[in-house]
Amino acid sequence: PERSTNCFGRREFSVNENERDWNDFESILKALDKFIKSGKIRYIGMSNETPYGLSKYLELSKNKNLPRMMSVQNPYSLVNRTYEVGMSEISIREKCGLLVYYPLAAGALSGKYKNGQMPKNSRMSLFKGWERMLNPLAMKAYEEYEKLAKENNITMVQLAQSFVNSRPFVTSNIIGASKLSQLKENIDSINIKLDDNVVREIDQVQSLIPN
C-alpha cells in the first residue's frame, strides 16, 4: 500500500519506481474497520511488512481512531534474522508481536538437504525459486547449527525452534509438518530452553555467516 514493498515476490524497495495501483493506508484501515463492525473479523494483522509500513498503520490507528494492527506475520529463523533490524523494536515497544513463518527456513534447518540431498516431494524439489535457501553460505550455516545442536544433545530442528520461541518479540511460531514425527519434534521444542552460552554461539555463527 502506498509504496513499493518487499512482499509476494518483490524483494527490494525502489524510490524511483512509481506505484500505479495502490490504496493508501487510511483507506485500508477504514475498510477493515467495516469488516470488524459487521462482525466478519475480530482483529487485524499484517504480513511481509516493513518498519515503515507497521509504524504508519500504528500511527494512523492512534490518531484517526481506527482499528489497530495486532500482529505481524513475517519470516524469521536462525538463517533469516532481518526482523531484528527495526521491526523487533517496534514489536516490543508497541506490543505488536511477530507471528513467525518459515522458522525452519522452508525445511532447510531440518538437515534434509545436506550433502546435496533433494528428497522427493520436498519443497525445494517441487517449487522453483527456493535456491536461495541452499546457497553455499546458507549450507555452511546449516552445518554449523547442526554441529551446535549435536553438542547440546538436541536436533537442529529443536535448536532452530527453541531459538525462535525464545525471542521476546515473538508472539507465536507457525510450524509446518507433513508427518507426525515432524510434528512431535516441533512441539517438543517448546520444552527446550537455550542457555546464554548456546545463544552466544548462535550469535557467533550469525556474525560469521550473516543474512
What is each PLM-predicted segment?
Residues 2-204, 209:
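Beta/alpha (TIM)-barrel catalytic core signal, keyed to glycine-rich beta->alpha loops juxtaposed to Asp/Glu
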